[in-house]
């Protein structure tokens, strides 16, 4: 659920971000566009890349890129750096949604796969509603940069968990 979470968590920080970066409200709103366009485009490629290179490798690369992109956002000194960080977040944040579904198809079938995908869909439905609340809560204690540090830490935990526990589900001979 990192993709939907990354879209909405920072929304409560828009005014503070505009002030600190010396950016207009429109420029801050454009950070959503810089995120969503690569997010949508890469949804077409994550599956293809995982079919060719393996599921685990693509998930790990996507999470690593998301961590680095989140840190770039957190330490942005101008709106252009924030735009770049958001674009890189968008490129990488959909990897779990696409490749995760492929991994489920690799190992589960029928009712088992449907049950797991229903649980995943529930997480994707909850994330957009919960993430602005989380962002607002973080703003009580940190400035807007803390939200991106939080996203980097969250993705780092997922990255370590995947490194330790996530197996490759697509055998080399089945790769295309």
Question: PLM ranges: what are they?
Answer:
Residues 61-65, 69, 85, 92, ...:
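Residue-level signature of the transmembrane alpha-helical cores
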Residues 85-124:
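Cytoplasmic helix-loop-helix junction between adjacent transmembrane helices
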Residues 41-79:
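Conserved MFS/SLC helix-loop-helix module at the cytosolic interface between two early adjacent transmembrane helices
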Residues 4, 8, 74, 90-98:
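Small-residue-rich segments within alpha-helical transmembrane domains of MFS-like 12-TM solute carriers
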């Amino acid at each position: 659920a990192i993709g939907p979470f990354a879209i909405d968590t920072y929304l409560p920080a828009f005014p503070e971000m505009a002030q600190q970066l010396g950016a207009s409200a429109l420029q801050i709103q454009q950070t959503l566009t810089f995120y969503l366009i690569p997010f949508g485009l890469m949804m077409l490629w994550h599956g293809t890349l995982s079919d060719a290179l393996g599921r685990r490798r693509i998930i790990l690369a996507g999470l690593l890129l998301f961590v680095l992109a989140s840190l770039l956002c957190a330490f942005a000194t101008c709106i252009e750096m924030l735009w770049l960080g958001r674009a890189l977040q968008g490129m990488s944040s959909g990897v779990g949604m696409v490749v995760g579904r492929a991994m489920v198809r690799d190992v589960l079938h029928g009712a088992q796969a449907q049950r797991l995908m229903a649980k995943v869909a529930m997480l994707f439905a909850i994330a957009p509603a919960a993430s602005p609340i989380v962002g607002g809560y973080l703003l009580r204690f940190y400035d807007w940069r803390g939200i991106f540090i939080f996203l980097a830490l969250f993705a780092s935990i997922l990255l370590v968990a995947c490194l330790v526990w996530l197996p490759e589900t697509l055998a080399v001979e089945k790769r295309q």
